[in-house]
Each structure stands twice: as structure tokens, then as C-alpha cells.
Amino acid sequence: MIYQAETLQVKEVQDGVAEILFCAPNSVNKLDLATLASLDKALDALTAHSGLKGVMLTSDKEAFIVGADITEFLGLFAKPEEELDQWLQFANSIFNKLEDLPVPTVAVVKGHTLGGGCECVLATDLRIGDKTTSIGLPETKLGIMPGFGGCVRLPRVIGADSAMEIITQGKACRAEEALKIGLLDAVVDSDRLYASALQTLTDAINEKIDWKARRQQKTSALTLSKLEAMMSFTMAKGLVAQVAGPHYPAPMTAVVTIEEGARFARNQALDIERKHFVKLAKSEEAKALVGLFLNDQYIKGIAKKAAKSANKETQRAAVLGAGIMGGGIAYQSALKGVPVIMKDIAQASLDLGMTEASKLLNKQLERGKIDGFKMAGILASITPSLHYAGIDNADIIVEAVVENPKVKAAVLSEVEEQVSEETVLTSNTSTIPINLLAKSLKRPENFCGMHFFNPVHRMPLVEIIRGEHTSDETINRVVAYAAKMGKSPIVVNDCPGFFVNRVLFPYFGGFSMLLRDGADFTQIDKVMERKFGWPMGPAYLLDVVGIDTAHHAQAVMAQGFPERMGKQGRDAIDALFEANKYGQKNGSGFYTYTMDKKGKPKKAFSDEIVPILAPVCAAQQAFDDQTIIQRMMIPMINEVVLCLQEGIIASAQEADMALVYGLGFPPFRGGVFRYLDSVGIANFVAMAQQHVELGAMYQVPQMLIDMAEKGQTFYGAQQQGSI
């Protein structure tokens, strides 16, 4: 043994050939701070080892290295710039040390080799993979960019254009593509991977492969003419500006980094990379996006605990109510390996549900995600039925009939008679209280809400609603089932609108009040989309949701929270509803809609809206962007905080993920609680109090006032990281 540490070891495997084996005691290898320090010492030991002829990098896991340890990021990024810069210099000196070994090096690349793992193997001379290899640099998805030499080495290995595509998109390449672009030097069968890599290294030692020329290319300036460079970088900047937009600076910064470093040799190019990395690491966007990643891991952890705690795993399910929603739920369950009965009283609805499932599976087939055999198997595991036959075998039943409390209660009561005492019943409802529906059941402890978002196959969030009598076992089983379906389940306590709809309607309330006071809805949409970062402005969102749906939900919320959400008079939603302008579904709402060539609705402004809104809106007047943002966001933020204060949602992490996954809250802002930390709670309180005359929706919750006085934050502990 040449060197041994907790997460890696170095030994001589044959005459003069040493192997650096990454072997962390956990389920995956990560380039955490401790592993980097060990790698540094291992390379020193190798440099001092006599008779060294070549070095192999291997892993004892199915994945080579999944990346850096993201749990350490926020702690690192919180350090002063100078300290972060020094740490990056140290980290890069390790990869330079690997690249500068006086002997050829080869990496045995299997499974996920991402982020820091990819940057590590880029420092070797040769890279051999197998069919499991997935290699790339996903850092821009976290608001940062490669900082261990990825922006320097990747363009020199595969060319600037391919490198910018991978880095700006945060892309991972499968083995075939990686081989084609030169990121891998060979792809072999898994059982021959180690032997092939050893043979490749032997060929390099015997100078059958010119490893020195390869290394020279990586440590020199990029070989691009002025014209090539201008065309390449100008085109990349144009594409990135179009796709990433102004709220996500990391992809553009990566292009600029590669461009600035192109004319320099490795060490100077690394200095440029480091300077830009530090700037991104200190940004609010990086803090928010890394925070979302950590929150997502937190939610996955809760789901894993629930699955372990549940006494029974869901093997079979049933959906009551077919159509688009029921078909979507059945498809998602079957796709993830849980066979499902789809029951309805109307054959036409069953046909619609099966058509929806077939349509979604055909899309998977077209994209090459599944083959025809797999598609047939998934479709066969959805059983459409007009009767309850076989439903007694279901472990979980999802009721997804029409949004009417009497109909839902009758269906739930009826199905309860058909199933065993262990069967869990759930209701897919967006507005009806779970405690109300539970009254129709003999076993309310086996019942909870399971609120899917539309379209089911695309929306990651499922709200799991705990009723007054719901047992922990029921919650654990439903959370585990939602996670098995590939969803992000978040448990909330029962109240009108649950969490997501409860916090959405004060936002719509702020919108209605702005219109009442003479604001232009097209300006509000532009500001909330372009400046704040929502995927849709409120008027457009209402049209997509459906004015009739929003009108009904608004009445439910007003009844549930009369002080804040009760209406003083008619508003814009009432005016459109009464004029039968329901939005996209009937071609006319705030905007008018026509179908484009692809069959997608395209919006346009029409003057016919003006007389409809006139009775509920003051004469048009100008509002600046900041006022619009404040008046729109304060009611939502207040309601989110009240939900935490009242225990409707358990944590800031879960609330922020629900907002991003369920409402499309701008990810670069990280959710309401991350946003409050970013702007400063005391600053928010002072700003919100300037609008207090607008009514109860603008009253700041006591929790925020107390936290502002104490100088507290919501993410203080997470911000410290694990260092």
C-alpha cells in the first residue's frame, strides 16, 4: 500500500503501475473537502514512489464520482472572497499535480462521473468508459460553473463549441456521445473495463500512445483563429442569452470565462476561471439554487424515512374517476411500476383516460425513453373498469372525481365498503377540506388528501393533506407511494386551499386590487415575468387555470379566511366570469387565444376586454415596477409565513420546494423564505408596513416582526453548511 485514507487508497497493481481507488464508506464517492485533502497527500506519495511508470484512477462504486459534496457549498460560499479564492487555488493545485505527474494517467470511468468527478478525470491523459458512463458538468444548474478546471480543460479536450454546450446546459453525456466528441477515448464492455484501461495505460507507458502530446494540448492555449473564436463565442453568447435569460448569470459567465481564458496556457486560464467562479459563488442566485438542491434532498430524505416507517408498501393502486386527470395519475403509477385499476361510471371517461395514458407513453416512445415492449407492458398494467371488481386488492385508492364535496363524499363512502380495513383512501382535491370528506367515512384514520397538480406527468409536487383523524401509517404509506411515482410529496395540515392554493389566492388578491386602482394588467404580467421571474404573469396564469375555476376557488378561500381574503365588492375575476370569459379553455379571458401550427394556444391582447373591466377598475394610471412587485408579492409572502406560523407546513425547506414545484416560483429566488433571507427580514417588514393601508392581506405576521427584531434568518443553519 502506497497510501491509505478513509475515502481513497493507493497501491501498486503491477510493476510500476499504481492505482488510486476511490472507496468512500458511503454509497457514493464524492469529492468532499476531506477527499480532496487525501487526494493531495496521495499524489505526493505517488511522486515520491520510486519506479512509478503509470497511474490508474478507479472507483469501487457503480458510479465513479458523483461530484463535489453540495452540502459543503453554502458554508464555503459564505466565506470571505479571499478565503474562497485561496481554497480554490489549493483545490486546483491538486488537479494540476495529477495532470503534471511524470507518467501517463488513465481514468476508469463508469456510471455517473459528474461535476468535480468529471473535472478530476479531465486532469488525466486518457479516459476509458463503459455503457453505464454518464459524464458531464451540471454546475450551472446550481447557479455556479465548473471551478476545478472544467472551463479550462474541457474546451481543450473536446473543442470550445462542444464544451460550451455541455457547461452552459449543465449537461451529462452518455457513453456513445462522450466517445464521439472525444470526452472518452474508448467505450468497452463493463466486464472488460478494468483490463482495457490497464492495457491502454501499458500502451501509453510503452509510447504506443502519445500521452505527452495530449497533455500538452490540455495545458496550452486553445488553438482557435481570431475569426473562429469570434464566431464561436458570439454565437454561444446569443444562444445563452436567449435560453438562460438575465436571471441566471452562470451560463453566460461560463462562456465569458472560456473566451477570456482561450488565449492563455493552463495556469493563467485557471486564474480567470477562479475569479469568475468566486463571483458566482457569492451571488444570491447560487445561494438560492444550491439551497433548492439541498431542500430537494431534504424532502427525498423525509420520503425515504416514511417508506421505512410504513408497515406496507404499495404494490397495487386504483384511481376513481378517469378522464385527463385520472388518466394522468394512472399513467404515472403504471410508468413507475405500480399496476392500477382506473374506475369510472362512464365508458367515454375511461376511453379518455386510456387515450391520455397512451398519448403520454407514445411521447416516451418517440423520445427513445422506452421501447414498444415496455410501452405495451405499462399500458397493460392499467385496467379500465366500470365496476369495482378487483379493487379490493388495491393498497391505495386515489379518488379523482369531479370537484364537488357531495359527489366525492358519496364515492369515498361507497368504495370504503368494497375494500379491506387496511386499504388507504385518498382524495385528489384542490379546495375541499379533508376533514369534511372524512365525515363520510367509517375509517377516517385511513384517509388523507393527495393533491396532484396538472398536468400530472409534468408537475413534480404532490400535496399530502393530513386530516384531523389521519394516522401516521396512512401518511407514511401515501408519502412513500407518491415518491415511488417519481413525485416530490410534501405533507401539509388541512385548511382551506391547503398550502399551495391558500398562498396563491392572496397573490391574485393583490392583482385584483392593483387593477381596481388603475394598473394595466399587461404591464403587471410583464413586470412579474421579466423582472420578478415568474413563468407567467397573474393575468396569463388566471387564463391558464381557468377564470371559472379561479372564481370558484376564490369563493372557497374568501369563506375560509374572510378577514384577509373576503372581497369588498366585484373584482376583475367576477367581471370576466360573468361575461363567460373563462380564459384559454374557451378562447377568451384577459387575453384572446388562437391555436398556432403546433396546436398550442397563442395569446394576444384584445380591446374587447376594456369595457368588461371598466366597471371594476379605476382610470388607468402608471405604477412603477417596484410598486407592482411589492403589491403583488407581499400578500403571498405574508400568507406563506402564516402557514409556517400556524403549522400548516412543517418547515421553510418544504414550503419553498412546494412553491417552486407547485407554482413555478422563480427558482433563482429559491422560494419565499430564501427570498426573505436574501432581501433581509427587517427590510421586508419595513417595506410591507408602507402598504398596510391596503388591508388585512398586507398585515405583517408576528413571526416576521419577532425575527426582524432578533436579526434571525430562516436558513441560518443551512447557510453554515457542514464545515
UniProtKB/Swiss-Prot annotation:
Catalysed conversion reaction: a (3S)-3-hydroxyacyl-CoA + NAD(+) = a 3-oxoacyl-CoA + NADH + H(+); a (3S)-3-hydroxyacyl-CoA = a (2E)-enoyl-CoA + H2O; a 4-saturated-(3S)-3-hydroxyacyl-CoA = a (3E)-enoyl-CoA + H2O; (3S)-3-hydroxybutanoyl-CoA = (3R)-3-hydroxybutanoyl-CoA
Binding site for substrate: D296, N501, Y661
Residue segments, region Enoyl-CoA hydratase/isomerase: 1-189
CDD domains: crotonase-like
Pfam families on file: 3HCDH, 3HCDH_N, ECH_1
Keywords tagged on the record: Fatty acid metabolism, Isomerase, Lipid degradation, Lipid metabolism, Lyase, Multifunctional enzyme, NAD, Oxidoreductase
Active-site residues (renumbered): H451
Top-level lineage group: Bacteria
Residues reported to bind NAD(+): M325, D344, V401, V402, E403, K408, S430, N454
CC terms in the record's Gene Ontology section: fatty acid beta-oxidation multienzyme complex
InterPro entries: 3-OHacyl-CoA_DH_CS, 3-OHacyl-CoA_DH_NAD-bd, 3HC_DH_C, 6-PGluconate_DH-like_C_sf, ClpP/crotonase-like_dom_sf, Enoyl-CoA_hydra/iso, FA_oxidation_alpha_subunit, FadB
Stretches for region 3-hydroxyacyl-CoA dehydrogenase: 311-723
Gene3D superfamilies assigned: 1.10.1040.50, 2-enoyl-CoA Hydratase, Chain A, domain 1 (3.90.226.10), NAD(P)-binding Rossmann-like Domain (3.40.50.720)
Annotated SUPFAM superfamilies: 6-phosphogluconate dehydrogenase C-terminal domain-like, ClpP/crotonase, NAD(P)-binding Rossmann-fold domains
Molecular-function annotations in GO: 3-hydroxybutyryl-CoA epimerase activity; delta(3)-delta(2)-enoyl-CoA isomerase activity; enoyl-CoA hydratase activity; long-chain-3-hydroxyacyl-CoA dehydrogenase activity; NAD+ binding
The keyword Metal-binding belongs to this UniProt entry's keyword annotation: no
GO biological process per UniProt: fatty acid beta-oxidation
Enzyme Commission no: 4.2.1.17, 5.1.2.3, 5.3.3.8, 1.1.1.35
Site residues (Important for catalytic activity), renumbered to this chain: E119, E139
Signal peptide: none
Pathway the protein acts in: Lipid metabolism; fatty acid beta-oxidation
Subunit structure: Heterotetramer of two alpha chains (FadB) and two beta chains (FadA).
Main function: Involved in the aerobic and anaerobic degradation of long-chain fatty acids via beta-oxidation cycle. Catalyzes the formation of 3-oxoacyl-CoA from enoyl-CoA via L-3-hydroxyacyl-CoA. It can also use D-3-hydroxyacyl-CoA and cis-3-enoyl-CoA as substrate.
Family (UniProt): In the N-terminal section; belongs to the enoyl-CoA hydratase/isomerase family. In the C-terminal section; belongs to the 3-hydroxyacyl-CoA dehydrogenase family.
Record's protein name: Fatty acid oxidation complex subunit alpha
GN (gene name): fadB
